[in-house]
């Protein structure tokens, strides 16, 4: 998929994207008995985070960010089997996540150790997807979906879209154009389209970056692009079981 085609897909995907947002909003509001956000309690030296969401692991990461300021990128695997997908209250398909509880010591928790424990605990639960914790060169963390279930309930390995090695000519563009170009190249090489959805558009349009590389992981290119904003931006790469598209949501951390 070329850059122009990616722009067209981005525009054409807006109606489906709006439907996806509405579905998520309905689910989060309790129409499908999901919680809007995870509940955090702390007793007897133990922190307990109770999530209830189609994507409970992401909800726990959001709670950890709220409590400790830990900024962690999150990427869905593909939810394609009957085991990993259910009908939502709006009659659209969503990941089949639900209740998930994570507990850890409240005594000066270490970010890396706690995140490792979180991912290991999640992978042992009955919730959809299988994840890995990845360290970044700058000391950050990515939680990456690397597997889903088959219709028989077996774990099937998948290639994470942002693991793909990209070759891009060095070109100076707005960061919005650069991220769209990365998404277009990932879409061209993978089985799913990746569409830039939510983002701090003003920042992405006002800042420019000269970026390229030979066989560089898409995740690294994306991270470098966002770093050029001189702000703190994290991402959520969410797979939509209805359209089979990935939607890349970029969020600006304020006050950092």
Indicate residue ranges for each PLM-predicted region.
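N-terminal targeting/assembly segments of extracytoplasmic apparatus and virion spike/baseplate proteins
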Residues: 1-256
